[in-house]
């Protein structure tokens, strides 16, 4: 039985990684997904190296960690790489999502592929937030305090969930230890979900390019050599640019309050998370009530998910009128993406609360109308 299971796993890996036949006219933007997987693997390797040096001390975690890294060979380089790769991963992730939204205009994507990709996005957001909290600086401490207090507003289980995360009646060393364990374990679960995403993508052939969608013939190529070389070239080209931020301008991704020692008796002058959390943080800031902000954030995430599913199903049943469908969908996507970017910028900056609320309400109505 063990040999059969091992043979089956080896066959699936060999079929999906080496012997996959795909269209020869795949666009170069498909390499963004390969770059995402490449940098996620490098991020996990750097994280495992840093996990050995983590010191679970609520007050002095950041400074002890920095001192350990200075004594450790290439320790600070590994930490700078880990931090810079976080911003890079979220940038590539948003580019990948935008690419998928645009290409759905031309190609139908299987529902299961998009559903697993949505789960990957939720995993990356959770892992990124836990990693943001672990250094326990002034900004991360109050970010964890605000978010855990928001979870406490969930009916019935909110208070129990908040105390379970804290491990006490307040944030302490045990809280950091719990979050550290989750931050180490969740990336390996993420790898399994990514393999599931790849398997569904290759099984349903959702990204087959122009070959099966239009009338002309296109030769199929083996994915093993040509596309791997092309995707690796793109990944190393991105890595070449990131090296500048790792070795020269590594403080570019840091806030100034990322070096402030935590003080539980003094709140931060401003609570401004990393740029990839600004969109989600805007919902919590735009609504005065904590539970309403959390509810709106969850509703919007699932509204975006249902919006794409609606477009996929619409494509399946409207293939006969492809030209009319393409024009109308381009119009919808232009309205949607412009509203998304405007909401991202407006909610990120400290402007009037009333303006943030009305912009949020308008965007929610647009998304619900498109659904």
From Swiss-Prot:
PROSITE patterns: CYTB_CTER, CYTB_NTER. Binds 2 heme b groups non-covalently. One of its GO terms (molecular function) is metal ion binding. The chain crosses the membrane at residues 32-52, 76-98, 113-133, 179-199, 227-247, 296-316, 329-349, 350-370. It is found in: Mitochondrion inner membrane. It comes from the Eukaryota. Heme b b566 binds at residues 96, 197. Gene3D superfamilies: Cytochrome Bc1 Complex, Chain C (1.20.810.10). A ubiquinone binds at residue 202. Keywords: Electron transport, Heme, Iron, Membrane, Metal-binding, Mitochondrion, Mitochondrion inner membrane, Respiratory chain, Transmembrane, Transmembrane helix, Transport, Ubiquinone. GO terms for cellular component: mitochondrial inner membrane. Pfam families: Cytochrom_B_C, Cytochrome_B. Its cofactor is heme b. The keyword Transport applies. GO terms for biological process: mitochondrial electron transport, ubiquinol to cytochrome c. Heme b b562 binds at residues 82, 183. It is a multi-pass membrane protein. Its main location: mitochondrion. Heme 1 (or BL or b562) is low-potential and absorbs at about 562 nm, and heme 2 (or BH or b566) is high-potential and absorbs at about 566 nm. Component of the ubiquinol-cytochrome c reductase complex (complex III or cytochrome b-c1 complex) that is part of the mitochondrial respiratory chain. The b-c1 complex mediates electron transfer from ubiquinol to cytochrome c. Contributes to the generation of a proton gradient across the mitochondrial membrane that is then used for ATP synthesis. Belongs to the cytochrome b family. The main subunits of complex b-c1 are: cytochrome b, cytochrome c1 and the Rieske protein. This is Cytochrome b.
């Amino acid at each position: 039985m063990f040999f059969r299971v091992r043979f089956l796993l080896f066959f699936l890996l060999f079929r999906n990684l080496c012997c996959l036949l795909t269209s020869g006219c795949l666009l170069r933007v498909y390499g963004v997904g390969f770059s995402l997987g490449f940098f996620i693997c490098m991020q996990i390797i750097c994280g495992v190296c840093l996990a050995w040096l983590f010191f679970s001390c609520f007050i002095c975690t950041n400074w002890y960690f920095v001192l350990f890294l200075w004594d450790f060979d290439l320790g600070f380089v590994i930490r700078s790489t880990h931090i810079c790769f976080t911003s890079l991963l979220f940038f590539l992730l948003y580019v990948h999502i935008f690419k998928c939204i645009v290409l759905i205009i031309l190609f139908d994507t299987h529902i299961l592929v998009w559903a697993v990709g949505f789960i990957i996005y939720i995993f990356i957001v959770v892992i990124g937030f836990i990693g943001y909290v672990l250094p326990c600086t002034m900004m991360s401490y109050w970010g964890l305090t605000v978010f855990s207090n928001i979870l406490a507003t969930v009916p019935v289980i909110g208070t129990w969930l908040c105390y379970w995360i804290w491990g006490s009646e307040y944030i302490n060393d045990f809280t950091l230890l719990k979050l550290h364990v989750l931050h180490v374990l969740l990336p390996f679960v993420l790898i399994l979900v990514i393999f599931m995403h790849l398997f569904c993508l290759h099984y349903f052939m959702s990204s087959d390019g122009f070959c099966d969608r239009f009338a002309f013939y296109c030769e199929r190529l083996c994915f093993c050599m040509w596309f791997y070389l092309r995707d690796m070239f793109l990944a190393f080209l991105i890595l070449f640019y990131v090296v500048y931020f790792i070795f020269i301008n590594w403080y570019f991704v840091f806030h100034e309050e990322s070096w402030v020692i935590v003080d539980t008796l003094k709140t931060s002058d401003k609570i401004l998370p990393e740029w990839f959390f600004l969109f989600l943080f805007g919902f919590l800031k735009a609504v005065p009530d904590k539970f309403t902000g959390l509810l709106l954030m969850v509703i919007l995430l699932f509204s975006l998910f249902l919006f794409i599913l609606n477009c996929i199903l619409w494509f399946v049943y409207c293939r006969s009128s492809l030209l009319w469908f393409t024009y109308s969908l381009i119009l919808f996507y232009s309205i949607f993406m412009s509203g998304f970017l405007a909401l991202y910028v407006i909610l990120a900056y400290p402007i009037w609360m009333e303006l943030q609320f009305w912009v949020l309400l308008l965007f929610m109505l647009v998304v619900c109308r498109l659904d």
